[in-house]
């Protein structure tokens, strides 16, 4: 074999070896720079991560607004005006709705509105009776309902002016108008059954009521339960029954005080202290003096010593001035309801004149358009009511 041929053979062998080596390198796996572990950790999905970082939900807040005011004391001149109002509309009977129309926006907008039906109702057609032994036209109930009241308290010194028949008739008429009531009863069982109003939010509000006096008229024979009489023991027992029945809030309405006095008396103070000391009572308000009295806080709860008259036709100018309380109760989460906003709303009812029926006004609204002597009268009412209600400087009270 020549040297040239031998060289050619070696070259061929080298090329073949090189080709095989290249094929083996090409078939070999490429080593990983960062080899993965045998089991990979599970990473949270974006939605899981969002849940982990989401702040806790705020507790739910529930609020309800309650309004209450004073005596619906149906003097005969109020009937006269209601008869004139009915005649203007071409109707017979009595129309009391125009009398109360001025306060309707406040009453109708509340979650619960409470009136005080001071006197018993007569049967349709009468006889209707004025002071001192009342029997009001039953037409008043239609106006009370149309104004937006949900509940009326009925325990007062005039509750048995027409005997047990008057008690029963009044409650029957309120029932017919779908207005709840507290303070008087037709049966013993009814007297023991708590009055609880359920708001549109599902909040249950109990109303308990009692009166200090029946003007010397005996309780109907054999019916000692017909009217709730005032004592801390009785009111607290009522409040406890309301709590047991599921009430979230309990309001105590008491007919007590010195007539025509703009200051609370010792009896009112003692009663307020006893009631507010109980966890079963959330707010106390009082009527009977026919004039506004101070409001205060006791045991961290609101006490309204006097809300004055809502409608009446008495002599003293102050008896035409009243005040409506508006309280917002709020609960956070599963806690108790407490007052988160407290307001007083001065009112004024005008005197009847033939051809000019009485009218009830929300003072702040009427002042926007009133002129002359009527404006001056409204300003006097606002000043007097504000000075009296705030005399004890209750923290957090606002004028509505």
Question: How does the language model describe each region?
Answer:
Residues 21-400:
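Acidic, metal/ion-coordinating pockets
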Residues 16-19:
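C-terminal motif of bacterial Sec signal peptides marking the signal peptidase cleavage site
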């Amino acid at each position: 074999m020549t040297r040239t041929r031998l060289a050619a053979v070696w070259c061929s062998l080298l090329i073949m070896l090189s080709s095989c080596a290249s094929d083996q390198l090409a078939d070999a796996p490429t080593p990983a720079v960062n080899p993965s572990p045998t089991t990979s950790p599970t990473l949270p999905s974006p939605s899981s991560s969002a849940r982990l970082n989401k702040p806790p939900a705020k507790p739910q807040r529930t609020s309800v607004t309650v309004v209450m005011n004073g005596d619906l004391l149906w003097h005969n001149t109020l009937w006269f005006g209601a008869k004139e109002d009915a005649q203007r509309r071409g109707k017979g009977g009595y129309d009391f709705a125009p009398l109360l129309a001025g306060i309707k926006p406040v009453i109708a907008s509340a979650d619960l509105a409470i009136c005080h039906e001071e006197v018993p109702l007569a049967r349709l057609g009468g006889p209707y009776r004025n002071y001192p032994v009342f029997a009001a036209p039953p037409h008043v109930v239609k106006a009370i309902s149309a104004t937006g009241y949900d509940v009326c308290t009925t325990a007062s010194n005039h509750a048995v002016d027409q005997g047990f028949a008057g008690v029963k008739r009044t409650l029957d008429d309120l029932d017919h108008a779908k207005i709840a009531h507290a303070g008087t009863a037709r049966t013993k069982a009814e007297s023991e059954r708590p009055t609880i109003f359920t708001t549109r939010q599902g909040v249950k509000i109990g109303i308990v009521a009692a009166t200090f006096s029946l003007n010397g008229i005996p309780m109907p024979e054999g019916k000692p339960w017909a009217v709730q009489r005032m004592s801390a023991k009785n009111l607290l027992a009522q409040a406890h029954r309301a709590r047991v029945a599921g009430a979230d809030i309990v309001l105590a309405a008491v007919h007590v005080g010195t007539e025509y006095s703009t200051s609370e008396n010792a009896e009112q103070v003692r009663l307020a202290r006893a009631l507010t000391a109980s966890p079963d009572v959330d707010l106390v308000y009082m009527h009977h003096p026919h004039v506004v009295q101070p409001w205060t806080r006791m045991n961290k709860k609101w006490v309204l010593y006097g809300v004055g008259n809502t409608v009446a036709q008495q002599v003293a100018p102050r008896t035409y001035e009243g005040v409506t309380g508006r309280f917002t109760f709020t609960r956070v989460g599963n806690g108790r309801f407490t007052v988160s906003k407290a307001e007083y709303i001065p009112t004024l009812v005008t005197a009847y004149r033939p051809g000019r029926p009485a009218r009830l006004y929300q003072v702040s609204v009427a002042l926007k358009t009133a002129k002359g002597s009527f404006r001056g009268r409204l300003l006097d009412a606002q000043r007097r009511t504000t000075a009296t209600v705030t005399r004890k400087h209750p923290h957090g009270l606002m004028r509505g």
